[in-house]
């Protein structure tokens, strides 16, 4: 590290950031350079990045804009930085995260070390049993609408290194490059897909929502995961007041509550029997609603519980169709299990953690796909629907541990 550089950035920091980016993989940016291509001249590329960052001459390239279809229509815009820029952002993130994360509210769960979406679902489930009413709200295009002035004000109150402030501002204003090659300047927002974007979103929402809620409505518990949040209230009147106040607060900070995706929900169950039009909400891929449950004494009752959402099931079924098993008839059943079990296991570990009975639809969908595969692979089963079903049943009896979901079919309700 040269003492003549304006900014003291250790070469080791760049090296460790590169290792982290490599581990996370990720797509190429506008230069179409992959990690493998970057590594062809690794020492030179890392030195060039360190030299520019430590001299203050690093300017982020435009961010590649990719539109991802949403489950209920429309698209979500993602910004994909180049490999080199992801390394630069990771250098900064590794420095600011230990400073910023400790100030965040305990009810903030998104993109934080040691915290997860499953923890957010667990705490929300518990609070739905304690509070009768929930305010579910959606922030319209939150990542795209963050006010740069307010965000940088928050950053400067915690981060003092000039070079970090310099590069954060440059990243915020780096243009998007559309699929058509047009470069679009940005005056608001932080690209969803950037390395530093999640922690910047958390900082912005800490002051916009978390701290504001803590000061103004300490009696109302909430759970926030990035730009997705729910608030628990003791009465319908309180929920109405809180929802109106949140909408006003978001507007003050340059954000907008989505009127069609925000509502008040009644947590209906066997003990809470009021009539109300909204008795379900979806949070982090789980739908919370009245569901049948079994007590320790084997009594059936209605509880307000989270289970995999219809949209999440739809995406998983689409993924199974994307496997195109009917084109893999040259492969043995055990090979299919080895190939797809990691995916099925990942789905179960998350969505099957709460009310696993709701995942039976996916299990049956996978099995139907395997039956079609068998009828296509074996001539003796061709065109015989029942024969395919019987064949798969025999396979389950012979090797009940072969596919991950076969081991879990017997999981109890609730």
Give residue spans per PLM region:
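Core structural elements
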Residues: 9, 60-66, 71, 172, ...
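A conserved non-catalytic segment of reverse transcriptases
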Residues: 173, 253-328
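Duplex nucleic acid-engaging cores and interfaces of nucleic-acid transaction enzymes
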Residues: 84-88
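Non-catalytic, peripheral interaction segments enriched in hydrophobic/basic residues
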Residues: 336-381
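A glycine-rich phosphate-binding loop feature that marks nucleotide/adenosyl-phosphate handling sites
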Residues: 225, 262-270, 340-343, 361-367, ...
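Non-catalytic, polymerase-adjacent accessory regions of viral genome-replication enzymes
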Residues: 1-43, 47
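Extended C-terminal regions of large enzymes
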Residues: 365-369, 374, 378-414
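Conserved polymerase palm-domain catalytic core
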Residues: 52-67, 71, 103-268, 280
């Amino acid at each position: 590290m040269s003492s003549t550089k304006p900014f003291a950035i250790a070469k080791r920091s760049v090296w460790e950031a590169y290792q982290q980016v490599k581990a996370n993989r990720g797509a190429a940016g506008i230069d179409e350079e992959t990690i493998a291509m970057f590594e062809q001249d690794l020492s030179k590329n890392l030195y060039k990045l360190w030299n520019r960052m430590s001299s203050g001459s690093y300017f982020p390239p435009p961010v590649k804009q990719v539109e991802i279809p949403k489950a209920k229509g429309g698209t979500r815009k993602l910004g994909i930085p180049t490999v080199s820029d992801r390394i630069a952002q990771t250098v900064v993130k590794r420095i600011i995260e230990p400073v910023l994360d400790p100030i965040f509210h305990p009810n903030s769960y998104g993109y934080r070390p040691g915290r997860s979406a499953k923890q957010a679902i667990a705490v929300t489930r518990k609070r739905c049993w304690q509070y009768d009413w929930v305010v579910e709200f959606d922030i319209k295009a939150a990542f795209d609408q963050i006010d740069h002035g307010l965000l940088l004000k928050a950053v400067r109150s915690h981060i003092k290194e000039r070079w970090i402030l310099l590069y954060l501002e440059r990243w915020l204003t780096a243009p998007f490059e559309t699929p058509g090659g047009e470069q679009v300047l940005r005056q608001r927002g932080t690209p969803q897909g950037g390395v530093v974007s999640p922690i910047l979103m958390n900082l912005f929402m800490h002051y916009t929502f978390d701290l504001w809620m803590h000061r103004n409505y300490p009696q109302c518990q909430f759970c926030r995961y990035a730009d997705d949040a729910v608030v628990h209230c003791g009465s319908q009147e309180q929920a109405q007041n809180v929802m109106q106040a949140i909408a006003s607060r978001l507007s003050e900070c340059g954000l907008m509550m989505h009127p069609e995706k925000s509502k008040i929900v009644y947590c209906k169950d066997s003990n809470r029997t009021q009539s109300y039009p909204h008795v379900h909400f979806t949070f982090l891929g789980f739908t919370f609603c009245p569901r049948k449950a079994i007590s320790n004494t084997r009594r059936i009752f209605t509880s307000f519980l989270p289970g995999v959402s219809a949209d999440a099931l739809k995406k998983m079924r689409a993924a199974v169709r994307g496997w195109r098993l009917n084109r893999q008839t040259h492969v043995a059943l055990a090979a299919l299990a080895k190939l797809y079990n990691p995916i099925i296991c990942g789905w179960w570990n998350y969505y099957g953690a709460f009310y696993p009975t709701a995942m039976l639809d996916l299990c049956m969908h996978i099995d139907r796909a395997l039956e079609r595969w068998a009828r296509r692979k074996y001539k003796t089963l061709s065109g015989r629907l029942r024969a395919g079903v019987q064949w798969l049943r025999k396979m389950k009896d012979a090797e009940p541990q072969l596919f991950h979901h076969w081991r879990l079919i017997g999981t109890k309700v609730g």
